[in-house]
């Protein structure tokens, strides 16, 4: 984006910092992931997990969820005020898997939230380390993006299920801060806004009184976040209209859905960060790696390098394919659920297949699943090359944004065309161009019509050998121009249910 003078880099958002230079950013991001690693090691000690059990991704997820729950102020307050049967508001826990006599056993553990908070703060130099918590939320969100489809949620808000590539970060909690807002897709922001407007339509008092004033501030803030993701003047002008509306209603919902559709071709800028499971940082810290001293970046070579030398295991159900389970976690680690499969495959060095062809369910194991038949296997999370993560959406320039396949939001800054089915997308734009946003709508449609599927994005950007940490020799891959690669093609994944 042209005007990045005032923007903080998303490493700065991630660490809550003011403007810092590159070295300071690397150090503070390093401090953040180092703290996660120290916390994880301490939890493994508390739970007396063996080395193998500590590398089990399911155990990592349980421990991550416990600390997120321990710091969820609003929910904790709610639980204390609305005691529900069988839920202790002061405790948190989950399933821990242990290896016993050649079999995997599930053990449900329960901890005082206060105790978990103490361990977390201790691992983070006595601070609350909110940035580390957000980092874990984004890792869970990336895992959800790769695992589940949000068709139902899209349909409920009146959007088209084919807009799934705009839904990055749709399961992030509201408290995920600026770093969370940066990774949310256009569709996610639109959906949050539509839900808000619908509540206002159904509940007369939603915008009224002291609470309503706060609601209004939240509404305008969300509008500004979404506006900042758009890269064309007309899209931004439409967002101003939506934001300034005296009494948001169906007209605003229409405008928002129009904007979401337009983002399939005039893509928004959405940040991508490689957030890894806590156990990976734990392994590195345990082996003596000093993240803060070495520095760390979420968008460069560091996560790739970390995954090259980490062995992580996963429980595998009887008819699941371990290679497919690995692909799922690899995509989650690199926030690549919405990336073009041609690009992901090239970087990973093995073919990345669409989700409809995966023989694997989610990573987490439900409490009613039979442990007798559970096996475990090593996740293959290594890559052949590395590439810089992007936040641009891959539009060729400001004036004329380039084309987007109906289902790609680029993750890696790598030269390619972004193929799309123009007829499918444009069919949605017949009809309504009257009303107060008519000139903007006309302008947006004109830009979309002039976008070409064969336009090359990220000109000259390539992938790098893993030995090339300074990114000096880009290798620009050549792709079959016609062959689009959406992960969600022929999809049969399960829905995301809270």
UniProtKB/Swiss-Prot annotation:
Gene Ontology cellular-component terms listed: helical viral capsid; host cell; host cell nucleus; ribonucleoprotein complex; viral nucleocapsid
Source organism superkingdom: Viruses
MF term (GO), any: structural molecule activity
Region (Disordered): 1-21
Gene Ontology biological process terms in this record: symbiont entry into host cell; viral penetration into host nucleus
Motif (Unconventional nuclear localization signal): 1-18
Motif placement: Bipartite nuclear localization signal: 198-216
Xref: Pfam families: Flu_NP
Location(s) in or outside the cell: Virion; Host nucleus
Predominant cellular place of this UniProt entry's protein: virion
Keyword terms of this UniProt record: Capsid protein, Helical capsid protein, Host nucleus, Host-virus interaction, Ribonucleoprotein, RNA-binding, Viral nucleoprotein, Viral penetration into host nucleus, Virion, Virus entry into host cell
Annotated function: Encapsidates the negative strand viral RNA, protecting it from nucleases. The encapsidated genomic RNA is termed the ribonucleoprotein (RNP) and serves as template for transcription and replication. The RNP needs to be localized in the host nucleus to start an infectious cycle, but is too large to diffuse through the nuclear pore complex. NP comprises at least 2 nuclear localization signals that are responsible for the active RNP import into the nucleus through cellular importin alpha/beta pathway.
Subunit structure: Homomultimerizes to form the nucleocapsid. May bind host exportin-1/XPO1. Binds to viral genomic RNA. Protein-RNA contacts are mediated by a combination of electrostatic interactions between positively charged residues and the phosphate backbone and planar interactions between aromatic side chains and bases.
Family (UniProt): Belongs to the influenza viruses nucleoprotein family.
Record-given protein name: Nucleoprotein
Species name: Influenza A virus (strain A/Tern/Turkmenia/18/1972 H3N3)
Lineage of the organism: Viruses, Riboviria, Orthornavirae, Negarnaviricota, Polyploviricotina
Gene of this entry: NP
């Amino acid at each position: 984006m042209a005007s990045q003078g005032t923007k903080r880099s998303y490493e700065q958002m991630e660490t809550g910092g003011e403007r810092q230079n590159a070295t300071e950013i690397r150090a503070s991001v390093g401090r953040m992931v180092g703290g996660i690693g120290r916390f994880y090691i301490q939890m493994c000690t508390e739970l007396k997990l063996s080395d193998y059990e500590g590398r089990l991704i399911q155990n990592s997820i349980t421990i991550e969820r416990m600390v997120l729950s321990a710091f969820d102020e609003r929910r904790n307050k709610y639980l204390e005020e609305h005691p529900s049967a069988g839920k202790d508001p002061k405790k948190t826990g989950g399933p821990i898997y242990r290896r016993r006599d050649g079999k995997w056993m599930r053990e449900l553990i329960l901890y005082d939230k206060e105790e978990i908070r103490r361990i977390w703060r201790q691992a983070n130099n006595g601070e609350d380390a909110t940035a580390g918590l957000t980092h874990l939320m984004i890792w869970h969100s990336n895992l959800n993006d790769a695992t589940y489809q949000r068709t139902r949620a899209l349909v409920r808000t009146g959007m088209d299920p084919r807009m799934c590539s705009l839904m990055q970060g749709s399961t992030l909690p509201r408290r995920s801060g600026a770093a969370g807002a940066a990774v949310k897709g256009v569709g996610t922001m639109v959906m949050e806004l539509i839900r808000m407007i619908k509540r206002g339509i159904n509940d007369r008092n939603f915008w009224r009184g002291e609470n309503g004033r706060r609601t209004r501030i939240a509404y305008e803030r969300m509008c500004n976040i979404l506006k900042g993701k758009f890269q064309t003047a007309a899209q931004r002008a439409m967002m101003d209209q939506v934001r300034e509306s005296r009494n948001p209603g169906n007209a605003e919902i229409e405008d928002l859905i129009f904007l979401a559709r337009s983002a399939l071709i005039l893509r928004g800028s959405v940040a991508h960060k490689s957030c890894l499971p806590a156990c990976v940082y734990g392994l590195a810290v345990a082996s003596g790696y000093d993240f803060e001293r070495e520095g760390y970046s979420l968008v460069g070579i560091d996560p790739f390098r970390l995954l090259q030398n980490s062995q992580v295991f996963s429980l595998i159900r009887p008819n699941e394919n371990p290679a497919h389970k690995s692909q799922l976690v690899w995509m989650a680690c690199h926030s690549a659920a919405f990336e073009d499969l041609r690009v992901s495959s090239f970087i990973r060095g093995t073919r990345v297949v669409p989700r409809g062809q995966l023989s694997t369910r989610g990573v987490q194991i439900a409490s009613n699943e039979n442990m007798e038949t559970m096996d475990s296997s090593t996740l293959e999370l290594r890559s052949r090359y590395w590439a810089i993560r992007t936040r641009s959406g891959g539009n060729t320039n400001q004036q004329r944004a380039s084309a987007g396949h109906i289902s790609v939001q680029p993750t890696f800054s790598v030269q390619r065309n972004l193929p799309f089915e123009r007829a499918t997308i444009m069919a949605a734009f017949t009809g309504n161009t009257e009303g107060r946003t008519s000139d903007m709508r006309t302008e947006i449609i004109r830009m979309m019509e002039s976008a070409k599927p064969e336009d090359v994005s990220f000109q000259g950007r390539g992938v790098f050998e893993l030995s090339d940490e300074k990114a000096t020799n880009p290798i620009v891959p050549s792709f079959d121009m016609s062959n689009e690669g959406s992960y969600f093609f022929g999809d049969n994944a399960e829905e995301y249910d809270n």
